[in-house]
Amino acid sequence: MVFSPRLSAFVALVALTNAATAVPMYGQCGGSGYTGPTQCDPGLVCVKLNDWYSQCQSGGAQPPVTTTSSPPVTVSPPPSTTTVAPPVATGPPAPEIPAGQLTQLRSFGNNPSNISMFVYKPQNVKNRPGLLVALHPCGGTAQQYFSGFPGFRQHADQRGFIVLYGQSPPGSSNCWDIISTASLTREGGDDSTGIASAVKYALQNWNVDPEKVFVTGTSSGAMMTNIMAATYPDLFKAGAVWAGTAVGCLSANTPQFPPDPCQSGTVIRTPQEWGDRVRRAYPGYNGPWPRMQIWHGTNDFALDHKNLAEQMKQWTNVHNISQTPTSTSPSTPRQGWTKQVYGNGLVETFSGQGAGHGLPESGTEVVAMDFFGL
């Protein structure tokens, strides 16, 4: 069969176009309302994490930089202590935790909803390490967040901090409780209580620097990030929210059909109303609040982009600063993203033109790590 030059050129163009639009490792490849490319790079498969988000992963979905191919191991903690003072450092922290792999903590204190916690300690962990709590999206797991969003542990390898990966409790559809009064209240007896217990355990037993404790998460994990900053502002110095909603916005823990009004971006409140929802999480608290960094894409079909502005209103009100940005930086940290700073850097927002729900985009995690000072 002989092809005409014009047809041959067309075939070559199609091949080039398909190659250009193939989704790289950990990129979004599907989900309800998603209109971007769905074909993964060679050797990758499109893995459904929930109705709203599918991600390109390797066939075995194995973490690319771990030092072991073994599944997560479980260790028993040392006997609990009644003091909150950190131990005197006599060597590398957390000697009972294997370095360079994901390790499950079997017990870490008060855990009323039976969440699971996993720890990643890098080989070069600092003697006085920082701590990052990383919370998976709805439909995900701690292992999936560890493998599918590798930037956090890669930066832990480079900077020597410890990462705690939370996992939502059994029977939760792998979603965090972001609506109950118990979870939205300090020591209320739900998911937020268990996460805080794990942080307190790390502070008591691993020589973690209390000035370098941070929280981050995607989607449902982003919502829980906001909740942790609201319920335990004395534990966390800052949070980074990837595709989330304001505290007290959603009325259900799992995606709804038709969408919850908050999902659709139709829940609009005043800064004072949003701020009050944070303040109610810890009545009487008058200390400093965590700095907050908020990321959202304009093509997020799971949680409307309008939720970025509502979160900004909430946290600027909590910090008692203006809702007018002090600076705007286009093409930051990359083309298509716009950064806005509020007050003296207490709140930052990043709006991604054309970005979907699968945040963080690979390579943008470093901006959050720098914001934290890890």
Swiss-Prot record:
What pH behaviour does activity show? Optimum pH is 8.
Name the Gene Ontology biological process terms: cellulose catabolic process; xylan catabolic process
User: Catalytic: where is this region?
Assistant: 100-374
Q: What class of enzyme is it?
A: hydrolase
Q: What domain of life?
A: Eukaryota
Has UniProt tagged this entry with the keyword Hydrolase? Answer: yes
**Which reaction is catalysed here?**
Deacetylation of xylans and xylo-oligosaccharides
- Residues annotated as domain CBM1: 23-57
Give the multimer and partner information.
Answer: Monomer.
**What is the official name of this protein in its record?**
Acetylxylan esterase
- Native organism: Coprinopsis cinerea (strain Okayama-7 / 130 / ATCC MYA-4618 / FGSC 9003)
